[in-house]
Swiss-Prot record:
Descriptive protein name: GMP synthase [glutamine-hydrolyzing]
GO terms for MF: ATP binding; GMP synthase activity
Catalytic residues identified in the record: C90 (nucleophile), H178, E180
Gene that encodes it: guaA
Involved pathway(s): Purine metabolism; GMP biosynthesis; GMP from XMP (L-Gln route): step 1/1
Binding site for ATP: S232, G233, G234, V235, D236, S237, S238
Occurrences of domain GMPS ATP-PPase (ranges): 205-403
Source organism per UniProt: Parasynechococcus marenigrum (strain WH8102)
CC per GO annotation: cytosol
Keyword Nucleotide-binding: yes
This enzyme's EC code(s): 6.3.5.2
């Protein structure tokens, strides 16, 4: 059965301690795919804190450091005495080996990066159903030179003698590869072995269980008080609206603030969809001129986000006085939102876990300090794919469930530089063409996001024997599972040609279309 804390919140069955790996959150996703709840915590979480959570298992993530470096991040050594199964991944394995008396050194041969066939020495326990020769993803420059007392080898590769190790009696396991990445062909089999057979977890992290628990937590938190929801029409806020409607009924008021940065036709679609089709009343607020005037002369992307976030709350506060009183503001904040805004990195000079801000998230980074609402964020522990499952279970139609993600600040952060009405109209028309053609090609649901970006430069062109000097549009299409990482989508040439021709011929002020082929990382999906 699932465990709950005294405040009704579900306790994690698997805790991932993060040592700065880019894959830490991916480990959490993979564990959740086995229907077992997992969370990511800082590597400095103490053994006593972990004992209080009563997890069934602990995973030590990879990381960019070397365990023998002066300021290497270290876990509480008392963790090894908790009696809880531990799986160390890459850096996590090396840390386990070193702290328990083994030796880790820089690889004497070649460092191992990329795919490598795994040769299984002991096909039982952790490596049950992991076939010999399976491809595993390697990313390490250090290796284990001597195992601690009581440890045995489970598998090796051509360049890594100790690719998987274990102390079977103490249920301590380590793998030098990354089972969580898609390139590791039997990675999920290994994760299931650890979660189910070694830790004894039960598959109780299901969509229906989450809904029941979230409804109970919201009811407990809110009581008889009223909640105001910022509805955008995307899958996150729409799922949140359906969930809150189920939990608190008419205590929920949905408000759609038209800030003027939506895609073409979306405000009208949103009002018709919720108000008429699903009988969820939505208060429509036309604040277009208010927002555009606040952004006059603003070019810095962080400043734009902060201004939009602050203005959103100001409008909410004003409208809540008219419609309220309201005590709570509901937000569709997701787990990746929190992760991306907070950062999960390790300072190489101090070994401390620090926040490295990429860009502030519109939900968690733009709130004013004098916020008059308490926050309700029942989706903040979910990944995007989990939100879609919840939406479907609540009866949200596929046209909403499978909509491409759209940022809270809208087109304002897809226009680089100053935002003007002219640029907004231009980008709306171009963006509509992109979405129309991708739908027509039957590729809309194969792509994570597809949109247009307007650049703050002009280029020379020739149209009708006349010189033009107009804006370029960037075509940005990416494939992803959860938005944490992404690759650029390989669209057919004919489709890209059609999109380019239509934009140049139909959108006034544009004479060039370029393609963004940057993955995340090193880039981000959005340009601002």
């Amino acid at each position: 059965m699932s465990q709950s804390s005294s405040d009704g919140q579900r306790q994690p069955a698997i805790v991932i301690l993060d040592f700065g790996s880019q894959y830490s959150e991916l480990i959490a996703r993979r564990v959740r795919e086995t229907e077992v709840f997992s969370v990511v915590l800082g590597y400095s979480t103490s053994a006593e804190e972990l004992r209080a959570m009563q997890p069934k298992g602990i995973v030590l993530s990879g990381g960019p450091s070397s365990v023998y470096a002066e300021h290497a991040p270290l876990c509480d050594p008392a963790i090894w005495e908790l009696g809880i199964p531990v799986l160390g991944v890459c850096y996590g394995m090396q840390l386990m080996v070193q702290q328990l008396g083994g030796v880790v050194e820089a690889a004497s041969g070649k460092a191992e990066y990329g795919k490598a066939p795994l040769e299984v020495d002991d096909p039982t326990d952790l490596l049950t159903n992991v076939t010999g020769g399976s491809t595993m993803w390697m990313s390490h420059g250090d290796s284990v030179k001597a195992l601690p007392e009581g440890f045995v080898r489970l598998a090796h590769t051509a360049n890594t003698p100790e690719a998987a190790v274990a102390h079977l009696q103490r249920r301590l396991y380590g793998v030098q590869f990354h089972p969580e990445v898609v390139h590791s062909t039997c990675g999920m089999a290994l994760i299931r072995n650890f979660v189910y057979h070694i830790c004894g977890c039960e598959p109780d992290w299901t969509t229906s269980a989450f809904i029941d628990e979230a409804v109970a937590v919201v009811r407990e938190q809110v009581g008889e008080k009223r909640v105001l929801l910022a509805l955008s029409g995307g899958v996150d806020s729409s799922t949140l609206a359906f969930l809150l409607k189920k939990a608190i009924g008419d205590q929920l008021t949905c408000m759609f603030i038209d800030q003027g940065f939506m895609r073409k036709g979306e405000p009208e679609f949103l009002m018709d969809f919720f108000d008429r089709k699903f009988n969820i009343h939505v208060e429509y607020i036309n604040a277009r001129q208010r927002f555009i005037s606040k952004l006059k002369g603003i070019t810095d992307p962080e400043e734009k986000r902060k201004i939009i976030g602050t203005e959103f709350i100001r409008v909410f506060e004003e409208e809540s006085k008219r419609l309220g009183p309201f005590d709570y503001l509901a937000q569709g904040t997701l787990y990746p939102d929190v992760i991306e805004s907070a950062g999960t990195n390790v300072d190489p000079k101090t070994g401390e876990r620090v926040a490295v801000k990429i860009k502030s998230h519109h939900n968690v980074g733009g709130l004013p300090k004098d916020l008059q609402f308490k926050l309700v964020e029942p989706l903040r522990k979910l990944f995007k794919d989990e939100v879609r499952k919840v939406g479907r279970a609540l009866g949200l139609p596929e046209e909403i469930v499978r909509r491409h993600p759209f940022p809270g600040p809208g087109l304002a952060i897809r226009i680089l530089g100053e935002v003007t009405d002219e640029k907004l109209n231009c980008l709306r028309d171009a963006d509509l063409i992109v979405r129309e053609e991708i739908r027509e090609a039957g590729l809309y649901h194969e792509i994570w996001q597809a949109f247009a970006v307007l650049l703050p430069v002009r280029s020379v062109g020739v149209m009708g024997d006349k010189r033009t000097y107009a804006w370029p549009i960037v075509l940005r299409c990416v494939s992803s599972e959860d938005g944490m990482t992404a690759d650029w989508s390989r669209l057919p040439y004919d489709l890209m040609e059609t999109i380019s021709n239509r934009i140049v011929n139909e959108v006034k002020g544009v004479n060039r279309v370029v393609l963004d082929i940057t993955s995340k990382p090193p880039g981000t999906i959005e340009w601002e």
